[in-house]
Amino acid sequence: MKRRELLDNALDRAALGVVVSSAVELSDLWSVALSLSASEPTRPTPIDAEDSISRERTADGYAMTYEWTDRPGRKWCLEFSIERSAYREAADKAHGYLSGFEAAKASSHAERLTEALADVSVTGERAWRSLPESVRLERAIGFVRSFKYVTDAESTGAPEYIRTVEETLVDGCGDCEDLTYLLVGILSQPAFSYRTAMVILPGHMLAAVHRDDLPAAYADAPTLPGGAYVAIECTTSRPIGDFQDEPVLAVYGDGIEYIDQSSITDTGWRFVQDPTQFQTIADASEGRPH
């Protein structure tokens, strides 16, 4: 079962002792074990009628309609279908944070979605392909930010559940990790071919793009620690390069791009209390000198 595989992986990572393991009591790990082995989703998350995303069940899948407005105020609409078998197959796969990141970049549905986005146009305007790259990037970011933010506990009943791109597209919602993977999946496709990364903050995750791949309009955007990547928030409407005022613990792109061991040590107990984080930091720290 997906929950059991995640549990075993998480407990193995916790045994590494890289996130101030002395702060963890046995009872805490047992509590995490019980919660991680709780119910897992077997069908799409319900979508509220007032949401900007709607879903219709078809004979062999789901017909999705997405409506969103980007930061400059342009309104967009996209219709996209996903096979029911693809959703179920994705839901049956267990992912940790790093494997979830890699799966998003390799997702065939993310590639098909990006091609569909390329054909979207606003009434009275040119098709998306003919627009400046900066506008195309803002459209993709606006698309991801239109998804409803929900915690895993709210949407699945489990304290931690890593959605694939396919699940997020059908569920129409996700937490910061799910939406980060969705944006990473889009921006990694040939239509953009960006070098992407996931950024770990205390209790939060966001996406990043290599500064050399961004359009010239963002040449002055601040970079993350390490200097190579620029942050993109997926759950809030912040400008590219701007993110919440928290220490950057790790940046993972083509391997570890940056890691702050001292901040991880200083805040490590928070990650152990929050099972959404300790596996990530353990994974990120495993191959680095301590």
PLM feature spans:
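A structural boundary/capping signal
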Residues: 5-290
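N-terminal secretory signal peptides
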Residues: 1-2
